[in-house]
């Protein structure tokens, strides 16, 4: 594979080769990353990238789209089946585009919206001042209870009744517990607000029935396809049928032009995988591994925000380890453990330094690791962050990654 690239552009080939070796060598604990299957990867690199297909199935602005229509329809039908959704738009290029698409469809500049505070687990597109969402719309932030580490629904209700938002946004990028979407629905109904759920991080768990399905209560549900869903980089919007025309118009021609049909095809492949029993078993293991890793870290005197996890991610509070999130990320990377610094709720260090590390188990689970391997990973993390023993940690990491190859099917690059 990639032999033509090797001849045509050896510089890019070598960079790709080094990146593949890094992925094989390292333990990947970034909660938003995963490892796609070979069929998904093959579809992304296919001739479907040659085709322009502005519009939607049966209503394109270019000729020759009959087979593209087949592909996009399959993707739509499959994801609707996974989540029991009434309508799906699979064209968003990213989760951010999916979120902005919903806002563009249903809000006007200056409308009042509620979203989770970024430093307490939310996402940039949920109203952060530096993001277009926070500049075009008037966002009010809710957060978590300082003692429990859980979403403070009393605060959510209080703010909602005070500001009367047109929309409430639920969902998070660094929240380790199950989110009660029904409670968000109750509050939204009390103030006459629309409810949008961003389930980008937990979509795979929802698909497997391991988390509340927001499609049952929300007006709009957005997701990425590359995290726990284990597909290509992209986004999706799910909504009630009554909003379908508004959503489709907002994506095209509203904020995007031609869809990426090679990516939509690989989304369809990913969705077929997500309908399988094997995928459900995989998600069960993702959750088991997260709990096992959390328990092993607690044994080693690590503090976890909320005291544990209900999903695929863990948020470490490093304030008792005398190390910042930024320094911890670097030290872990030196030991071949990839993670990301992350703010913890009420973080004194700010977003560039932070006091926390976010960990996730989707990628290591895809490689085949189980609960007993989480104990080894926890030991490696402890060696790095408590004892500054990166060399010993590297030995543990290499032993694991050599045991669990990235792609067993074939040698991707020589």
From Swiss-Prot:
Amino-acid positions noted as binding (6S)-5,6,7,8-tetrahydrofolate in the UniProt annotation, renumbered to this chain: 118, 122-124
Domain of life: Bacteria
Keywords of this entry: Amino-acid biosynthesis, Cytoplasm, One-carbon metabolism, Pyridoxal phosphate, Transferase
Positions of the record's site feature: Plays an important role in substrate specificity: 226
Pathway(s) this gene product operates in, as recorded in its UniProt entry: One-carbon metabolism; tetrahydrofolate interconversion; Amino-acid biosynthesis; glycine biosynthesis; glycine from L-serine: step 1/1
GO BP annotation list: glycine biosynthetic process from serine; tetrahydrofolate interconversion
EC number annotated for this UniProt entry: 2.1.2.1
Broad class of enzyme this protein falls into: transferase
Family statement drawn from the similarity comment of this UniProt entry: Belongs to the SHMT family.
A Pfam family annotated for this UniProt entry: SHMT
Gene that encodes the chain: glyA
SUPFAM superfamilies, alphabetized: PLP-dependent transferases
PANTHER family registered for this protein in UniProt: SERINE HYDROXYMETHYLTRANSFERASE, SERINE HYDROXYMETHYLTRANSFERASE 1
Function: Catalyzes the reversible interconversion of serine and glycine with tetrahydrofolate (THF) serving as the one-carbon carrier. This reaction serves as the major source of one-carbon groups required for the biosynthesis of purines, thymidylate, methionine, and other important biomolecules. Also exhibits THF-independent aldolase activity toward beta-hydroxyamino acids, producing glycine and aldehydes, via a retro-aldol mechanism.
Modified residues (N6-(pyridoxal phosphate)lysine): 227
UniProt-annotated location(s): Cytoplasm
A Gene Ontology molecular function term of the record: glycine hydroxymethyltransferase activity
Species annotation: Clostridioides difficile (strain 630) (Peptoclostridium difficile)
Subunit structure: Homodimer.
UniProt protein name: Serine hydroxymethyltransferase
